[in-house]
Curated annotation (Swiss-Prot):
Region described as Disordered: 406-452, 476-530
PTM text: Phosphorylated.
Gene: Zic2
Identification of the protein by name: Zinc finger protein ZIC 2
Family designation: Belongs to the GLI C2H2-type zinc-finger protein family.
Lineage, top ranks: Eukaryota, Metazoa, Chordata, Craniata, Vertebrata
InterPro entries noted in UniProt: GLI-like (IPR043359), Znf-C2H2_ZIC1-5/GLI1-3-like (IPR056436), Znf_C2H2_sf (IPR036236), Znf_C2H2_type (IPR013087), Znf_ZIC (IPR041643)
Originating organism: Mus musculus (Mouse)
Cellular compartment(s): Nucleus; Cytoplasm
Length: 530
């Protein structure tokens, strides 16, 4: 049932909910009189005796809460004088019967109602304001003098969160034709003005008659969570800047220039094609059709400007097509694995790359006893140098060579860190290099230093040489060298200058053994490292 907003709507949560028993008879009489007047007004509205704008208005469906509103909010519905609205005589009688409690009832006072039930409150209508300081376009002409003015300090009762009005050229952009965007789903708009009179009539191009058949009653459940609805609307509302950025990206066009030089040109110097294209597909199609030609072409030469091949032909057309991608930048083979994003110019490169995702290693080392496997044949070829002792990767700054390019790159860092290229740095040692580590060099490698040593130091050096000779004998299997070195060591430890000299000789022999032993050790270490 659609109730009228006048005598049926009391001040929400104020005195109308707490009735007093000694006024029940007067309230019942007022309710009966008010119901009779309302039925007469509704019947007259159906017969066309009252203004259509006053009879047909939108409505808000309200679910009043159990708590009471503050006096400041309840004062939004101020008192009105008798005779301002149909049925006001009954309202005046009810106010007189209530006596001292009449202050608790607002201008829309009426009979009490059950707070647990829903009621309807008529929303403000649309229409031109009455001339001569009438209502501000809220109701029809017949209801222009219903409300008194309200102060600007009062807040909205239905939507307390609405910001205050702004006037002048800097008014809020959310206010359009007296309507404010409430931030609710469905683009609901509400009036930003309060219930008050204005000095001048509102210039509204839409009259009440025009809007009568366009806007029906609007029901809105006020028990919903307003804050959650506004947050939901804000979350799904995209900022307009994202759209403009997207459109700007679509408007940016690439300029791909064809640099193919026609060899049949008579001019000198010859000029390139210089045709521009907006997409890579257009450029590739142009080069394939206009310059490369079909299967009738027997000479597959790249005539792209500044091509490093310098006119050297290809054996097949597909090889020329693959080569042209170096100039055009075309990479038509993307990696299908999600999140990778890599693209390739050749299908075989994509095939090799996909093995990094699948873990496939189909290329096994061909050397007997080695079970190393690789994802591509080039890595296996580099690995084979470990077994064949080939060291094709030479250092350009020194005479060292390596079996793998990664070892050469590590070695080049030594030259970058030390400009003099010191070869005694431990960082220069690698499993692939052929030089002797400095820690295993025999003291006899520097014969000039042994003559300046004391007898005790010479004996210690001879002992170290004997130990090195023993290591050499283990790797070489030569027992005679070990015994000779041991004899030299014993002679060196016997004392005297001659003993020192004998120790030096033994040290020398041990040095040669150490060198040979290290060769075998280095070879074994290379196999283990790789």
């Amino acid at each position: 049932m659609l109730l009228d907003a006048g005598p049926q709507f009391p001040a929400i949560g104020v005195g109308s909910f707490a009735r007093h028993h000694h006024h029940s008879a007067a309230a019942a009489a007022a309710a009966a009189a008010e119901m009779q007047d309302r039925e007469l007004s509704l019947a007259a509205a159906q017969n066309g005796f009252v203004d259509s704008a006053a009879a047909h208005m939108g409505a808000f469906k309200l679910n009043p809460g159990a708590h009471e509103l503050s006096p400041g909010q309840s004062s939004a519905f101020t008192s009105q004088g008798p005779g301002a609205y149909p049925g006001s005589a009954a309202a005046a009688a009810a106010a007189a019967a209530l006596g001292p409690h009449a202050a608790h009832v607002g201008s829309y006072s009426g009979p009490p109602f059950n707070s647990t039930r829903d009621f309807l409150f008529r929303s403000r209508g649309f229409g031109d304001s009455a001339p001569g300081g009438g209502q501000h376009g809220l109701f029809g002409p017949g209801a222009g003098g219903l409300h008194h003015a309200h102060s600007d300090a009062q807040g909205h009762l239905l939507f307390p969160g609405l910001p205050p009005e702004q006037h002048g050229p800097h008014a809020s952009q959310n206010v359009l034709n007296g309507q404010m965007r409430l931030g609710l789903p469905g683009e609901v708009f509400g009036r930003s003005e309060q219930y008050r009179q204005v000095a001048s009539p509102r210039t509204d191009p839409y009259s009440a008659a025009q809007l009568h058949n366009q806007y029906g009653p609007m029901n809105m459940n006020m028990g919903m969570n307003m804050a959650a609805a506004a947050a939901h609307h804000h979350h799904h509302h995209h900022h307009p800047g994202a759209f403009f950025r997207y459109m700007r990206q679509q408007c940016i066009k690439q300029e791909l220039i064809c640099k193919w030089i026609d060899p049949e040109q008579l001019s000198n110097p010859k000029k390139s094609c210089n045709k521009t294209f907006s997409t890579m597909h257009e450029l590739v199609t142009h080069v394939s059709v206009e310059h490369v030609g079909g299967p009738e072409q027997s000479n597959h030469v790249c005539f792209w400007e500044e091509c490093p091949r310098e006119g050297k032909p290809f054996k097949a057309k597909y090889k020329l097509v693959n080569h042209i991608r170096v100039h055009t930048g075309e990479k038509p083979f993307p990696c299908p694995f999600p999140g990778c994003g890599k693209v390739f110019a050749r299908s075989e490169n994509l095939k090799i790359h996909k093995r990094t995702h699948t873990g496939e290693k189909p290329f096994q080392c061909e050397f007997e006893g080695c079970d190393r496997r690789f994802a591509n044949s080039s890595d296996r070829k580099k690995h084979m140098h470990v077994h064949t002792s080939d060291k094709p990767y030479l250092c350009k700054m020194c005479d060292k060579s390596y079996t793998h390019p990664s070892s050469l790159r590590k070695h080049m860092k030594v030259h970058e860190s030390s400009p003099q290229g010191s070869e005694s740095s431990p960082a220069a040692s690698s499993g692939y290099e052929s030089s002797t580590p400095p820690g295993l060099v025999s003291p006899s490698a520097e014969p000039q230093s042994s003559s300046n040593l004391s007898p005790a130091a010479a004996a210690a050096a001879a002992a170290a040489a004997a130990a090195a000779a023993a290591v050499s004998a283990v790797h070489r299997g030569a027992g005679s060298g070990s015994s000779g070195s041991g004899g030299g060591s014993a002679a060196g430890s016997g004392g005297g200058g001659g003993g020192a000299g004998g120790g030096g000789g033994g040290s020398s022999g041990g040095g040669s053994g150490t060198t040979g032993g290290h060769s075998g050790l280095s070879s074994n270490f290379n196999e283990w490292y790789v």
